[in-house]
Amino acid sequence: MIISMNQTEPAQLADGEHLSGYASSSNSVRYLDDRHPLDYLDLGTVHALNTTAINTSDLNETGSRPLDPVLIDRFLSNRAVDSPWYHMLISMYGVLIVFGALGNTLVVIAVIRKPIMRTARNLFILNLAISDLLLCLVTMPLTLMEILSKYWPYGSCSILCKTIAMLQALCIFVSTISITAIAFDRYQVIVYPTRDSLQFVGAVTILAGIWALALLLASPLFVYKELINTDTPALLQQIGLQDTIPYCIEDWPSRNGRFYYSIFSLCVQYLVPILIVSVAYFGIYNKLKSRITVVAVQASSAQRKVERGRRMKRTNCLLISIAIIFGVSWLPLNFFNLYADMERSPVTQSMLVRYAICHMIGMSSACSNPLLYGWLNDNFRKEFQELLCRCSDTNVALNGHTTGCNVQAAARRRRKLGAELSKGELKLLGPGGAQSGTAGGEGGLAATDFMTGHHEGGLRSAITESVALTDHNPVPSEVTKLMPR
């Protein structure tokens, strides 16, 4: 924010209001600005508005003119928006927070509760869920409070001003970089399946690098955020307002420093990730399409052709959905802030509302990610169903009716029995018999579990026709080495 000294024009306030600041005899700037909400409010990688310079002029102890009652009420209640929008924004943010927190919590529990889910690639999804959970529980509530407040609502601790801004940026950077890492990892696994697969230690190292990079990208906010206290004119003090008003501002060393950082954030947090995600998933689409074509020629069953075509269509829809949802979610907020930084228009209530809507669209990614990376993954969906329907295998429904829990319990018993039978059958097959079940070379990669990066060759297809193997009952070690990775 720019503070201009010794100017005579009145300061521009929200909703067209004006209030003059004043300079003391010692030439230190004292001013009161009705609201610089988006200057003092940083929502992570994206910044909001740089308002015009705060102008100061002489103001006597009683004020140069009477203040509007609405303006006085906003100061006394520390509200930047009127009641209708105030309650609507709280409700809309509340819905996002609840659904986002619930979905991401399910993902975290699903990975932690069972060892079989703690794979190297699931760590990326776990990391994304943790960052999105922080978006829901930290970034959104803090941002909502700052949007609704006319001045800094969190007391006089300057470290809190710096930390909150950096934490908001950190969560968004981690979320978008994690999405990019997931896309790149899937590209490597599916397009280059013969390369060494990612190990657990390697995945942990990459995740540590993601957090370190995000922390580095967010660190300028910790450096340049400052908490300042402005003296309140006597007129407002007489009606009960505190002696000083706190603002958490960005104090960049140059006038355009904030604009440059906004450009940098736009590139790192939006343009580069959307480019990588789009290119990676387009490459995956082409690879899967070529595999399906090869296997379709070799397939002897019309039903198998239909099933592979259905799976390919589902995968294509998922690929397109991930890229589009990511782009659409973050586009409004990034370009709103870029436009606002260039225009430096006075902040009004309508601008605050537009900003809040763009911000909620961006934060909606925290709600969609558990669906795209969790529910659409067969492994995670089964875990979600078990978490949401915790019942024992012997649970008996009331009134003698069968419930969904009973059905799931029976299904789990069948899967367990199938796994035991499959182990016996595979031992009878032996290495030679197992090898004969493959579809042969690249053609054997008939279908790909896109969400996990595991391939299904002719061997697994042959097995699953007789015995239902699930992700909780993986292929035994006797034949794992024969399957392409």
UniProtKB/Swiss-Prot annotation:
Keyword annotations for this protein, in alphabetical order, are: Behavior, Disulfide bond, G-protein coupled receptor, Membrane, Neuropeptide, Receptor, Stress response, Transducer, Transmembrane, Transmembrane helix
Q: Which family does the record assign?
A: Belongs to the G-protein coupled receptor 1 family.
The free-text tissue note of the record is: Expressed in midgut, brain lobes and ventral nerve cord of larvae. In adults, expressed in a pair of dorsolateral neurons in the protocerebrum, and the central complex and a small number of neurons in the subesophageal ganglion (at protein level). Expressed in a subset of sugar-responsive PAIN neurons in the thoracic body but is absent from other peripheral PAIN neurons.
- Subcellular localization, as worded in the UniProt entry: Membrane
Question: What organism does the record attribute this protein to?
Answer: Drosophila melanogaster (Fruit fly)
Q: Name one GO biological process term.
A: G protein-coupled receptor signaling pathway
Under the heading PANTHER family, the entry gives:
NEUROPEPTIDE F RECEPTOR, NEUROPEPTIDE Y RECEPTOR
Q: Which gene encodes it?
A: NPFR
Q: Which residues cross the membrane?
A: 92-112, 123-143, 164-184, 203-223, 263-283, 318-338, 356-376
**Domain of life of the native organism:** Eukaryota
Name this polypeptide is given: Neuropeptide F receptor
**What ranges are annotated Cytoplasmic (topological domains)?**
113-122, 185-202, 284-317, 377-485
